[in-house]
Amino acid sequence: MEKTDEERKKAQMLDARARNISHNVRCTECGSQSIEDSQADIAILLRQLIRNEIGAGKTDKEIYSKLEDEFGETVLYAPKFDLQTAALWLTPVIIAGGTAAGIVYQKHRLRKNVDIMALNLIRGVPLTPKERVTILDVLIPPSPPPQGVVSRLRRWLNR
């Protein structure tokens, strides 16, 4: 009687392992379902292949490798993180960072140009330090208050 309990537990463990692997494999016919959830013929065959491989004593990694070799990387829900995947995920971040840096640089450059123009206007004019500060205060416009997305949206909607 004990052997049957042990055999039953072993069979349940193998079945749970097969289901776990099947949940991580995409049905090649359905596309959006795992082979565990799909009733397509190919999904049934893949589930049987996984159970046969487990019965042969292969590890999960070996089974995933075999499936990837036979059906391609798209059959797995968790593809490898390689150079192509990194480029796919990091490109939007790099573009957003570059755009933000460009905007900050343009605003800084514009502000710096106004300061230089104001200084060039009063160059050579005999002024006391107090008069110089007063004229620069008049010539250089104040920095605009920081504007958030909400205030810009309101201004755009009120046009």
UniProtKB/Swiss-Prot annotation:
InterPro entries: CcmH/CycL/Ccl2/NrfF_N (IPR005616), CcmH/CycL/NrfF/Ccl2_sf (IPR038297). It is a single-pass membrane protein. GO terms for biological process: cytochrome complex assembly; embryo development ending in seed dormancy. The keyword Transcription does not apply. Heme binds at C27, C30. Residues 1-82 are mitochondrial intermembrane. One of its GO terms (cellular component) is mitochondrion. Keywords: Cytochrome c-type biogenesis, Heme, Iron, Membrane, Metal-binding, Mitochondrion, Mitochondrion inner membrane, Transmembrane, Transmembrane helix. The chain crosses the membrane at residues 83-105. It is found in: Mitochondrion inner membrane. One of its GO terms (molecular function) is oxidoreductase activity. The keyword Transmembrane helix applies. Residues 106-159 are mitochondrial matrix. Disruption phenotype: Embryonic lethality when homozygous. Arrest of embryo development at the torpedo stage. Interacts (via N-terminus) with CYTC-1. Interacts with CCMFN1 and CCMFN2. Plays a central role in mitochondrial cytochrome c maturation. Probable component of a heme lyase complex involved in the reduction of apocytochrome c. Forms a complex with CCMF proteins (CCMFC, CCMFN1 and CCMFN2) that performs the assembly of heme with c-type apocytochromes in mitochondria. Belongs to the CcmH/CycL/Ccl2/NrfF family. PANTHER family: CYTOCHROME C-TYPE BIOGENESIS CCMH-LIKE MITOCHONDRIAL PROTEIN, PTHR47601. This is Cytochrome c-type biogenesis CcmH-like mitochondrial protein.
